[in-house]
Swiss-Prot record:
NCBIfam families: PRK00823.1-1. InterPro entries: PCD_sf, Pterin-4-alpha-carb_dehyd, Pterin_deHydtase. It comes from Chromohalobacter salexigens (strain ATCC BAA-138 / DSM 3043 / CIP 106854 / NCIMB 13768 / 1H11). This is Putative pterin-4-alpha-carbinolamine dehydratase. It comes from the Bacteria. It catalyses: (4aS,6R)-4a-hydroxy-L-erythro-5,6,7,8-tetrahydrobiopterin = (6R)-L-erythro-6,7-dihydrobiopterin + H2O.
Length: 118
């Protein structure tokens, strides 16, 4: 378990600042398999997870969904045969917040508890 995954998400208001470039790289080092992408001018954190079949991918999607509901912070999830793409960003602030990195670390823990193809 990473230290980052042990942190609690904090309430994020619309005027909360996005993480700085330095924070992005520092926090990103704790979730090295995630990549930072920019879509429509919004920085996002994304990772693709692979599984042996659709049932495992769907089970993982539901586990991430449960995690998201518990924290009140929700990703974009694309579920395909043997693959799930998870994308975290803070909708209210239109970019990355520390919460996104916390949730990425927690998503990694969910993945580690599942049987995966890779």
């Amino acid at each position: 378990m990473s230290e980052l995954s042990e942190l609690k998400c904090e309430a994020c208001s619309a005027d909360a600042p996005t993480v700085s470039e330095a924070e992005m790289h520092s926090l990103g080092a704790d979730v090295p398999e995630w990549r930072i992408v920019e879509r429509d001018g919004i920085m996002q954190l994304e990772r693709e997870f692979t599984f042996r079949n659709f049932a495992q991918a769907l089970a993982f999607t539901n586990q991430v969904g449960d995690l998201a509901e518990a924290q009140g912070h929700h990703p974009a999830l694309i579920t395909e045969w043997g693959k799930v793409t998870v994308t975290w960003w803070s909708h209210k602030i239109g970019g990355l917040h520390k919460n996104d990195f916390i949730m990425a670390a927690r998503t990694d823990e969910v993945a580690q508890s599942n049987v995966r193809a890779d």
